[in-house]
């Protein structure tokens, strides 16, 4: 893996002070960046806070939901972070999921069209002008890509792409789609960074690590975008069973095979996780963004263990 970044978010067991501590530890360990996820928190505001407590490490969002903010407001927020952090910010953009957006009363329309329009407005605003930031800002825009059309769009108009839950075969396929999109946009794909978001469950007890991993995949496999991608990647049987389970959570968990876990997550001992990370990050992946979930220990211990295990 060329570079490794840490991913984190504000949770009951990871308050702001912990995020600052982890970011500093990741910086000292040679990690390339810290990416904030967006789960009932503001990923951009959190990135600014972490930037003010670090010196060199990149700050990013993985991802910021484009449906929650007007593009011009998003441009001003992101430009402010870029200015305060000395140009260390990467804005990762995603559409979220129909299931979560509809719960907020958001009608998504056509996500691909919305993403294209958002990036266009962002680019124009970031160049300055009446609706743009106080000063023009050079800001890398990374697009979360799951489906083939969104990955191609990232190649056409983005500075990078963020993959998540991608088995190695899907990574290889998606890198080809990214190159196709770059060709459409008249761009060199070498200038578009491909990143892989990888969730880790680290424990010397493999079965203990697989239990929470199974629960995670039973939830994400039920989502349309991820479920379709996993089914397309050779896990049709598992996804069909997860969807058939409906609200029966136990049945959905049982439908997740060890093969699906190993193809999409980092699970097991520190040595096994390092090996799996190398296998998941095919040639062409520039940065692995690792998010850690604890296994029979508190989150702080789990995150610090991950930082030590993946020290650059």
Where are these regions (language model features)?
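Active-site-adjacent structural elements that line small-molecule/cofactor binding pockets in enzymes
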Residues: 1-312
């Amino acid at each position: 893996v060329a570079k490794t970044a840490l991913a984190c978010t504000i949770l009951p067991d990871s308050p702001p002070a912990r995020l600052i501590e982890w970011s500093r530890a990741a910086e000292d360990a040679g990690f390339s960046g810290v990416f904030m996820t967006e789960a009932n928190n503001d990923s951009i505001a959190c990135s600014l806070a972490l930037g003010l407590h670090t010196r060199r490490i990149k700050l990013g969002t993985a991802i910021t939901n484009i449906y929650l903010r007007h593009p011009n407001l998003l441009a001003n927020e992101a430009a402010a972070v870029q200015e305060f952090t000395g140009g260390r910010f990467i804005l990762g953009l995603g559409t979220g999921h129909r299931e979560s957006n509809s719960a907020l009363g958001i009608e998504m329309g056509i996500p691909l069209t919305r993403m294209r329009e958002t990036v266009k407005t962002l680019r124009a605003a970031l160049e300055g002008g009446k609706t743009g930031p106080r000063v023009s800002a050079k800001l890398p825009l990374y697009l979360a890509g799951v489906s083939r059309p969104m990955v191609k769009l990232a190649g056409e108009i983005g500075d990078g792409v963020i993959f998540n839950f991608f088995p190695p075969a899907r990574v290889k396929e998606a890198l080809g789609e990214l190159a196709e999109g770059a060709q459409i946009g008249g761009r060199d794909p070498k200038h578009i960074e491909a990143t892989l978001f990888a969730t880790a469950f680290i424990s010397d007890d493999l079965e203990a690590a697989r239990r929470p991993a199974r629960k995670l995949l039973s939830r994400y496999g039920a989502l349309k975008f991820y479920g379709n991608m996993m089914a397309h990647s050779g896990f049709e049987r598992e996804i069909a069973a997860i969807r058939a389970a409906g609200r029966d959570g136990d049945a959905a968990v049982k439908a997740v095979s060890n093969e699906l876990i190993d193809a999409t997550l980092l699970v097991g001992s520190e040595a096994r996780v390092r090996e799996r990370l190398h296998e998941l990050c095919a040639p062409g992946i520039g940065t692995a963004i690792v998010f850690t979930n604890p296994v029979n220990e508190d989150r702080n211990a789990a995150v610090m263990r991950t930082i030590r295990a993946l020290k650059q």
